[in-house]
Amino acid sequence: MALAPARTKYRKSQKGSRAGNAKRGNTLAFGEFGLQSLTRGPMTGQQIEAARVTISRHLKRKGKLWIRVFPHKPITKKPAEVRQGQGKGPVEFYIAQIRPGAVLFELAGVPATTAKEAFRLADAKLPFHCRFIAREGAVV
C-alpha cells in the first residue's frame, strides 16, 4: 500500500515553489548512516516503499531503518479524453517534494559497507541522484 496522509485539511493544493536547498531534515538525526539527495524532484509513496523494501531485503532484517520523508502533497489528474475547464481533477496520488540535501533514509546497527551497498541499491529505485553520508566519528 502506498504512503498517503490519513487526513488532510485541504483536499487539493497548488503547485508551489521548488527552489532552494533543504533547510530542515538535512542532517542525520537517528542513525549512523544516511541517504542524502543531491538533486530535486518529486518522490511518490510507491518509490519510498520500493526503496524501503530494497534496503530491508539487502539487510536481511538486521539493523534499524528510519524513513525521513513522507508524501504530503496531493497530485491531481484529469481523466483521459476530457475537455479542458470544468475545474481541477481528482487527487491521483501524493508526493514528497525532495530538495537537494534532504536526508531520505537512515540506518543504524549495520556495518558501513553493508549500509553503503543497501543505499546504492535503493538509489537505483529513486528518480534523482543521492549520496551516502555517515555520522561524524562513524567507522566507514
Swiss-Prot record:
GO cellular component: cytosolic large ribosomal subunit
Regions that span the bilayer: none
Biological process per Gene Ontology, one example term: translation
Keyword annotations: Ribonucleoprotein, Ribosomal protein, RNA-binding, rRNA-binding, tRNA-binding
Keyword Ribonucleoprotein attributed: yes
PROSITE patterns per record: RIBOSOMAL_L16_1 (PS00586)
Subunit structure: Part of the 50S ribosomal subunit.
HAMAP family: Ribosomal_uL16
Purpose: Binds 23S rRNA and is also seen to make contacts with the A and possibly P site tRNAs.
Similarity comment text for this entry: Belongs to the universal ribosomal protein uL16 family.
NCBIfam families found in the cross-reference section: rplP_bact
Protein's recorded name: Large ribosomal subunit protein uL16
Gene: rplP
